[in-house]
Regions:
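Acidic/aromatic-lined carbohydrate-recognition and catalytic surfaces
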Residues: 5, 10-143
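Intrinsic disorder/low-complexity segments
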Residues: 1-2
Length: 143
């Protein structure tokens, strides 16, 4: 009987929220895992919440449902933050100066994907130009 009560004492109830990162605010057409996600986590902590359930984070098919991922291992590229790529030196301020006017009421996944793919190409080109002993290349070599 004592074991049952000690187990209950060790367990604690936690509360949180279910929201996909793509639902976070972003001028890039869809929320991502950049600064806005960090602000959201800070907000959750300030609100006394402990959990953020995100839904699956994999690449999606034509209907863009997080439950229709075509890989259980890959991540959704749209969740890559252009702001963090800028912070890492892989994008320039000028790369982010002409952000399209994405709809605010719903996500235009095709437009967002086309826009972000161009940014990713620029970032990858700059990444390849980094010296082999750069800190970023060293970090990614460990993966």
């Amino acid at each position: 009987m004592n074991d049952k009560f000690s187990l209950l004492k060790k367990m604690r109830r936690l509360s949180g929220i279910l929201v996909h990162p793509t639902s976070l605010p972003s001028k890039f057409g869809v929320g991502d895992l950049g600064p806005e996600a960090y602000r959201f986590v800070d907000f959750l902590q300030e609100a006394g919440q402990h959990l953020w359930q995100t839904l699956p984070l994999g690449p999606t098919g034509g209907h863009n449902s997080p439950y229709q991922c075509f890989s259980s291992f890959a991540g959704q590229p749209l969740l890559i933050s252009p702001e963090l790529l800028l912070q890492e030196g892989l994008l320039a301020e000028s790369d982010l100066s002409n952000v399209p006017a994405f709809p605010e009421e719903e996500v235009d996944f095709k437009a967002v994907q086309a826009y972000k793919e161009e940014l990713f190409k620029k970032a990858f080109t700059r990444f390849k130009e980094l010296p082999e002993d750069s800190e970023l290349k060293s970090e990614l070599a460990l993966l």
